[in-house]
Amino acid sequence: MGGPGYLLDAWQIQAIDGDTIRYGTERIRIRGIDTPELAEAGGFDATQRLTRLLKDGPIRIVPHGRDVYGRLLADVYVNDQNVAELLRVEGYAKSRP
């Protein structure tokens, strides 16, 4: 797993879509993946899967700067499992550099 990051409880995190979460007012983009937008085919399913994964907390956020939209770019782990990798393997996400 990446650096120490921040350990959060599941109730503190909300899925915005399949590759973006919210912690308070902070929007966090999951690094390394892209999922369909909510209005696109597969977007709702990806968001629901991410929501279910987050409920399995605790959640570790390992920041890697910000993206072009100002969102925190981070590796996200649930119970030490990489969320991006889980979503890719399960077919909800594609790799994104």
What are the language-model segments listed below?
Residues M1-P97:
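Small beta-barrel nucleic-acid-binding modules, primarily SNase/OB-fold domains
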